[in-house]
Amino acid sequence: MFNTAVKILYRSLIELTNHRLSSYLIKGFCESKISKPVIPLFSKHFRLNWDDVDGTAADYGSLSELFIRQINLERRPVSKEAHAVVSPVDGVVQTVGIINPNQTFTVKGKDYSFAELTGCKSADHQYNGGYFVVLYLSPRHYHRFHSPISCRYQKLAELGNRSYPVNQLGLKYGKDVLSKNYRFVYELNSGSRNVLMIPVGAMNINSIVQTNTRTELEIGEELGYFSFGSTVILVFEKDAFQPSAHLAEGQEVQVGELIGYEE
């Protein structure tokens, strides 16, 4: 009863604040020089790690510039192990699981539709029974996403037009946020296997930008960025991925870090 009441209140508050005007105003503020004085407060509140960044808070002209900051990728060595799959982002592992036979996957006790998430309507596809990994980027994390494998890739779909919070509260009390939010669906082909990589937008700023125009990517190569903290979902074919021993809910991971192996 209590959880139901909290869920209704949470969704109502989100709907009241999540519309085009508020998104426009927040985005405009973050991109303007007016937001520059907020950077030190933001950095302190979210405990940004400046050791990985060339420069200081004073070098950024706006919050938006800070969100999409570059980092020294020499501090993110890409795993050289054979058949390695690496983390595409700096973030936190929210869930590791397997796509269910009924075409759903479960995150934080909620069932999501694989078809709705990916736009794949066929019930007969190679991802049935495969692993999925959900990685959450908080506002403090580096906001760029990279390729988890060496591959050829294509963008299969651009879905959703609004976004809701993808943090712990959003997953617990929101309504199917991972399969409703604005998102891209990429298919990565390593030559023998396919992997789906799905960057999912976050509330208000709701922006995903692809920076790489090449059709082939090296493992760890940048593909794009978010304009605010968000989520990346990886989906593997059945019997095509073996998670590493440390890949567990709540684990912090970094770009280039080993998260498993292609099989």
Swiss-Prot record:
Record-listed E.C. numbers: 4.1.1.65
Single annotated GO MF: phosphatidylserine decarboxylase activity
Catalytic residues as annotated in Swiss-Prot or TrEMBL: D90 (charge relay system), H146 (charge relay system), S230 (charge relay system), S230 (schiff-base intermediate with substrate)
InterPro entries with a match to the protein in the record: PS_Dcarbxylase, PSD-B, PSD_type1_pro
Keyword Lipid metabolism listed: yes
GO annotation, biological process: phosphatidylethanolamine biosynthetic process
Enzyme type, top EC level: lyase
Record note on cofactor: Binds 1 pyruvoyl group covalently per subunit.
Membrane topology: Peripheral membrane protein
Pyruvic acid (Ser) modification, residue list: S230
Processing and modification events after translation: Is synthesized initially as an inactive proenzyme. Formation of the active enzyme involves a self-maturation process in which the active site pyruvoyl group is generated from an internal serine residue via an autocatalytic post-translational modification. Two non-identical subunits are generated from the proenzyme in this reaction, and the pyruvate is formed at the N-terminus of the alpha chain, which is derived from the carboxyl end of the proenzyme.
UniProtKB keywords: Cell membrane, Decarboxylase, Lipid biosynthesis, Lipid metabolism, Lyase, Membrane, Phospholipid biosynthesis, Phospholipid metabolism, Pyruvate, Zymogen
Cleavage (non-hydrolytic), annotated site positions: G229, S230
Function: Catalyzes the formation of phosphatidylethanolamine (PtdEtn) from phosphatidylserine (PtdSer).
Membership in a protein family: Belongs to the phosphatidylserine decarboxylase family. PSD-B subfamily. Prokaryotic type I sub-subfamily.
Assembly and binders: Heterodimer of a large membrane-associated beta subunit and a small pyruvoyl-containing alpha subunit.
Protein name: Phosphatidylserine decarboxylase proenzyme
Source organism per UniProt: Bacillus subtilis (strain 168)
Gene transcribed to yield this protein: psd
